[in-house]
Amino acid sequence: MLWVIGINHKVEVDIRQKFSLIKTKLQEKLISLKKLANEVIILSTCNRTEIYFFSEEYVDIEKIFTELDWDKRYMHLFYIYKDKDCIKHLFEVVCGFDSLLIGEDQIVAQVKEAKEISKLVGGKNPVLERLFEVALKCSKEFRTKARLNEHPITIASVVGKVLKESNIRKIAIIGLGNIGILFCNYFKNSDVDKVFLIGRKNEKIDQFVKLNPEKFRYYDKKKTILEAQCLICSTSAPHSVVHKDDIPEGKNLLIFDLAVPRDVDVEVYELPNVKVIDIDQVHKIDTINREFRISKMQENYHIIDKYVDEFIDWLEFRQYRNLIMEMKRHAEQLCKAQVKYIKNVDSRERKEVERLLIRMANLYIDRAIEVLREAHKEGSGEICSNLIKRIFLK
């Protein structure tokens, strides 16, 4: 059974942040959830928390909430998609349909990262890894055909448009992870004067400082807030990092709080000269090529349907995997047995003959697999598999 449970940007950030899974805790959470299902992948971003499962049977949602220590009063806000609906949902997500910024491409890197983090836990996720790989393949073709790469949209470009319209030229970035890097990439070619960097130093951020030290520099948070006209907050901290006491009295300041959980304490929102825009409000100012993106995405939706069908075919064909493995094992045993009858050859030559026989046997098996695949698509897979058993295994 393939299914996903999740909560996304359609639920307000104040509630959504209660279920955000911090990156440093993801491996620990994956280990806990592996008690409930054979395969698990967590996709956790500022816009969504989704858990994908592949298991023999569906897991009770209450067990998941218990394992993650989540408040069960909010269970009704979560969606659950099963089998084909689950596949379709992931493909829509990675193609940008289910984003605050329609068509944005940051989700592609986030889906890749989710797949890689699941590998660190150990154990195999053959079905979910294949699902995510096909989703990424689908996204690549979809974005190319829909020409989304010609008109890219990111949270940085949306925020950058606001800053330009407001003539803001001194910006502070608090949090130097993936979002921080995204903004640095955007600002390196913009006409802002200063970009103050607050957070843990890393090699990628160092490159911006080295290439343009006049624009980019690491700075102390307190001094930064005195000088900056705008704060862009995107840390992965489980608590707020900007408080009322950090803001000088009467200071005019624009803050983009892009983190989930929030980086900015609620008291800051109430300061008279401070305007805070959170992650859920960003989509309201997304006007860059929006109609073009929506139109092109709708025109190319058939690409998603194609990949959904492709994955379902692969998933259904997996029922024959034991038969295929048994055929190959049986063929290898027969080849090794026949080699024993060869006389007057040394061990190296015997091994070479054995490899050649196994290779030839696999050519016939591969053809049998193709015939089985064709029969399965035509609805006669069971008849064909029984015939293959009689030919190859009896």
From Swiss-Prot:
Any one GO molecular function term: NADP binding
Site annotation Important for activity: residues: H89
Keyword check for Acetylation: no
InterPro entries, sorted: 4pyrrol_synth_GluRdtase, 4pyrrol_synth_GluRdtase_dimer, 4pyrrol_synth_GluRdtase_N, GluRdtase_CS, GluRdtase_dimer_dom_sf, GluRdtase_N_sf, NAD(P)-bd_dom_sf, Shikm_DH/Glu-tRNA_Rdtase
UniProt-listed GO biological process terms: protoporphyrinogen IX biosynthetic process from glutamate
Pfam families xref list: GlutR_dimer, GlutR_N, Shikimate_DH
Gene3D superfamilies: Glutamyl-tRNA reductase, N-terminal domain, NAD(P)-binding Rossmann-like Domain
Top-level EC class as recorded in UniProt: oxidoreductase
Pathway named in the protein's UniProt entry: Porphyrin-containing compound metabolism; protoporphyrin-IX biosynthesis; 5-aminolevulinate from L-glutamyl-tRNA(Glu): step 1/2
Name under which the protein is recorded: Glutamyl-tRNA reductase
The organism of origin for this protein: Caldicellulosiruptor bescii (strain ATCC BAA-1888 / DSM 6725 / KCTC 15123 / Z-1320) (Anaerocellum thermophilum)
Lineage: Bacteria, Bacillati, Bacillota, Bacillota incertae sedis, Caldicellulosiruptorales
Gene this chain is encoded by: hemA
